[in-house]
Amino acid sequence: MSAAETSAFMDRADKFLAVANTLASDLPFSQISASMMFATARFNAFVAQAKGLEPGEVDEVTVAYFCGEYEKMLRENLAQILSSKKVPKL
């Protein structure tokens, strides 16, 4: 990604995190996390269908792709957060 694309990507992610931060004042983090994961899975199912998957079809390649991407991002964020002494703001 170019610097501009990376910046736009992070800005979009920050918008989702801003919603999570707002919800965090009233709900446990675990509930917010579960809702965000469900919403992401739901949206990615829509993306897969828009790219040609039939409604109700489960494509293991698509599942593996999204799981792999999530795992990479989670590991990267865990390493970044756990190496910091500062508790991050969600």
Regions found by a protein language model. Give the residues of each.
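Solvent-exposed interaction surfaces and binding hotspots enriched for charged
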Residues: 1-90
